[in-house]
């Protein structure tokens, strides 16, 4: 069953907020918008520096979409409910952190690196300890950033000694 407004109970509206997770949605009921993981708290972003993201471009678009949601109260999944002004401030902070990660990946790729080398440098940069869970979460997030940057023409790849290397494109 495809998730569309016509399959929802009357008075409930679907909010397409892809990016943090594939096909992520929120719901609006009356003047309340339930926005799931569309934003992360300052505390989480400050503590970890990098959060799981499925698709960076979609995530940035969803942060912009939040501006257009007509609601009085916004209920994120892991943050206290807030008004629109607070939401827009937090969305701006999420956007800032995402831009910093984009910049960090480009800086780390000033010299060609394999994905594994880049992943290690990301872990070192954010002072994280690698384990299986973090390898999977941050590894897939890093691949989302690589995809975003490659599609934007900001990084490129090459093959050398049977290894795929990523490198920032010099302007």
Model feature map: region roles:
Residues 1, 66-70, 154:
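A structural motif corresponding to the C-terminal end of an alpha-helix
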Residues 1-8:
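Active-site HxH/HxHxD metal-binding segment of metal-dependent hydrolases
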Residues 9, 29-31, 161:
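Residue-level signal for tight coil/turn positions that link beta-strands
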Residues 13-18, 22-102:
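Metallo-beta-lactamase
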Residues 107-171:
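C-terminal regulatory/interaction regions
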